[in-house]
Amino acid sequence: MDKNFYITTPIYYPSGKPHMGHAYSSIVADIFARFKRVEGYNVLFLTGTDEHGLKIQREAKKNKKDPKIFCDELSKKFKDLTKILNLSNDDFIRTTEPRHYKSVEELWNRLVKSGDIYLDKYSGWYSVSDEAYYDKDEIKELDGKKISAISGSPVDWVEEESYFFRLSAWSEKLLKYYKDNKDFILPSSRKNEVVNFVEKGLKDLSVSRTSFSWGIPVPK
């Protein structure tokens, strides 16, 4: 049986130049990739840039540039970083590439066909910088402004029509998988934390946005 090993860095958000944190994450992933190759694994080591979202759109406008041009310039700096650090990555993915668009559209259509995506309305506290929604118990007030209690980032109340991924339907399947594959969650010290989180019930996930245009269009 082939021994395959896949590892990825976070695909970095190019709203600014690379910094020490990006270098740290990349080097850690590179160490794992090199070690697994020595052990005889077929390694696929990925890194890249996540180039869509409201934050990118706003930063591009702030710099008076088209979002794609803005991303082209900054993504190159992240790609150059892989050479400066002598990383052994096998691929560098950009979410603005046609191959990524094609993969997203294919996955979306499969999920629609299987009934795992549905259209509904969403309302909640949204952080542009975190690109995440927060529940009301995850919000606090500071100096008269609402912020995320988790990240400290400002949040705004948002209401919009959205497609949702039916994550709630996968709770039992995930719990069974964790039980049958005891080494799946590493380090093992985190296993109870993950299991307890899933046992509480997973919420369906909003997977589309109408509040900005810089993203992959929802397939028709």
What is the predicted function of each stretch?
Residues E105-G115, D135-D143, G201-S211:
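Short, charged low-complexity intrinsically disordered segments located at boundaries
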Residues M1-Y118:
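N-terminal Rossmann-like or analogous alpha/beta NTP/dinucleotide-binding catalytic cores
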Residues D91-K102, D120-Y133, K191-N192:
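Short, glycine/charge-rich beta-strand/loop segments that flank catalytic centers
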Residues S114-S171, L175:
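Cys/His-rich short segments
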Residues M1-T47, R99-S103, I150-K220:
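Structured secondary-structure scaffolds
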